[in-house]
Amino acid sequence: MTIIEELGKKAKQASYDLLGLSTIEKNQMLTQLAKDLIEKSDFIIDENQKDLQKAEENGISEVMVDRLKLTAERIKGISEGVLQVAELEDPIGQVIKGYTNLDGLKIVQKRVPLGVIAMIFESRPNVSVDAFSLAFKTNNAIILRGGRDALHSNMALVQVIRETLIRLGHNPDAVQLLEDPSHDLAEALMSATEYVDVLIPRGGAKLIQTVKEKAKVPVIETGVGNVHIYVDATADLEMAKSIVINAKTQRPSVCNAAESLIIHEEVAENFIPLLEDAIEAVHKVEFRVDDKGYSLFKHAVKATENDYATEFLDYILSVKIVSSLDEAISWINRYTSHHSEAIVTRDIQAAERFQEEIDAAAVYVNASTRFTDGFVFGLGAEIGISTQKMHARGPMGLEALTSSKYYINGNGQIRE
């Protein structure tokens, strides 16, 4: 039996065991897990330090190390996310619709678990707990495969979860970690159609593309964030400055951070010096600029075609000058990763057009794209941000981890 077959069989059995759990039992488990994460934070941080030390030895960038790092404060945040999931309404068993048909059959459509979820993700170890809490709340078993850079952190977090499951009398195989981060095993997991009901990749463009090309199990595509902010001709420039600085510098390593700035030519000459001076006071940002805007910056490099298609996840921002709203919309739809896009404008009609015509899961008017987040949207911890249109789109909370089933009751009807 291969490693993937063993994980798959255990996960499938756990998914059946989970079907009988009540909302109360699930919430008790999550509440206890939140406490255990805090109590065992020293152990988790010690294991995380092993990953951080290796990252530094390998010359990983400051931004990527930040994605990997766990502190007492961050573990507290993870714990609070678990508690929030416990407090959310349980979607399992909810009636979507019900009716009696012409044959007298009583037909009810209810929400049910997906079954076994596999998740392949990179760097951020908090994903282990976020994904488990959402899967468990929806009676799903989950197989996790993190990146090798976060292996010790993920092992520690999954160990804490499994210990809590055992202590409360649940099947610990409700969560399993693929501890060998080899590409061959990852590809085997992508092909485990006998066991895995859905695969959710969460990471960079290379990971997402690999999964799209090689997966045989159903996939919900998430999260590459080539995010644009368009500063319109009518924009409040002080507002635009604040939004761009927040979206780019607050946490550049996340998928809802801005990667590209589009500026209307009528405001470029005034806005660029305003932005450049203000952003320098926060953090040095490298601007990669088109020919039209290059001379307006004190410090910039010429942009390449590839820059406009890149999720930098760093203090880098591509810049494009446009002559109209039409050009801005066309440009963004050409390069968007369908995640989050924003416009800063005073023009209501421009705002409405932008929101209707931009092909993305979340489209903002006069606000930072950093808000695209399950917690912010009231969904609790998210399992990912879907950039596709089938099944789920945008931040995926509990409902995105459910399917539906028809329950039909009769009294002897046969079809004539």
UniProtKB/Swiss-Prot annotation:
GO BP annotations, alphabetical order: L-proline biosynthetic process
Protein's UniProt name: Gamma-glutamyl phosphate reductase
Family (UniProt): Belongs to the gamma-glutamyl phosphate reductase family.
Principal localisation: cytoplasm
Summary of the function given for this chain in its UniProt record: Catalyzes the NADPH-dependent reduction of L-glutamate 5-phosphate into L-glutamate 5-semialdehyde and phosphate. The product spontaneously undergoes cyclization to form 1-pyrroline-5-carboxylate.
Substrates-to-products reaction catalysed: L-glutamate 5-semialdehyde + phosphate + NADP(+) = L-glutamyl 5-phosphate + NADPH + H(+)
Pathway(s) it belongs to: Amino-acid biosynthesis; L-proline biosynthesis; L-glutamate 5-semialdehyde from L-glutamate: step 2/2
Pfam families xref list: Aldedh (PF00171)
Keyword Cytoplasm: yes
Keyword terms, alphabetized: Amino-acid biosynthesis, Cytoplasm, NADP, Oxidoreductase, Proline biosynthesis
A molecular function GO annotation: glutamate-5-semialdehyde dehydrogenase activity
Stretches of the chain forming a coiled coil according to its record: none
GO CC list: cytoplasm
Gene: proA
EC identifiers of the protein: 1.2.1.41
UniProt-annotated location(s): Cytoplasm
